């Protein structure tokens, strides 16, 4: 890609959304436009089954910002998407009860979103990651194989 990305992100080629790191000056530059980046990615690929079709996922409309509440253990067999919520979750991901996901959010393949975790919007998660129980994540990019242990704030 370039010296900067090669130096700070040596495995960037394996990250599905590596284009967001092209032509950046500082490592945090993509975070400045993360909302727009996620919405662009979702607009380019809105494939996947509807989130509403998955038993055990409830769309919470009682809040000011709509979200998904996980009511039981779920392992997704295929991608799911909600254009209304601006959320996409890839197949192989495990969702545990009481997790809450607000959009915009993209969650890659084969992740574990553990009990009580709170993805609070503007979240881009790579593949094979773990969001530990009672961990809150917002305005963040988690590359592949990141493990955010329990009781964290990211």
Where are these regions (language model features)?
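Terminal amphipathic alpha-helical/low-complexity segments used for targeting or macromolecular assembly
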Residues: 1-79, 83-85
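Structural signal for interior beta-strand "rungs" in well-ordered beta-sheet cores
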Residues: 59, 63-64, 69-154
């Amino acid at each position: 890609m370039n010296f900067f990305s090669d130096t700070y992100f040596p495995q960037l080629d394996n990250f599905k959304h590596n284009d967001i790191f092209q032509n950046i000056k500082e490592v945090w530059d993509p975070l400045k436009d993360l909302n727009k980046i996620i919405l662009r990615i979702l607009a380019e690929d809105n494939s996947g089954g509807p989130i509403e079709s998955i038993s055990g996922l409830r769309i919470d409309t009682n809040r000011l910002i709509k979200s998904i509440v996980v009511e039981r253990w779920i392992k997704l067999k295929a991608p799911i998407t909600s254009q209304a919520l601006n959320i996409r979750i890839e197949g192989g991901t495990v969702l545990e009860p009481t997790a809450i996901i607000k959009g915009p959010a993209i969650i890659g393949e084969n992740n574990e979103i553990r009990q009580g975790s709170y993805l609070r919007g503007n979240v881009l998660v790579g593949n094979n990651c773990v969001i530990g129980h009672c961990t809150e994540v917002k305005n963040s990019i988690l590359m592949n194989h990141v493990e955010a242990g329990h009781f964290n704030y990211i």
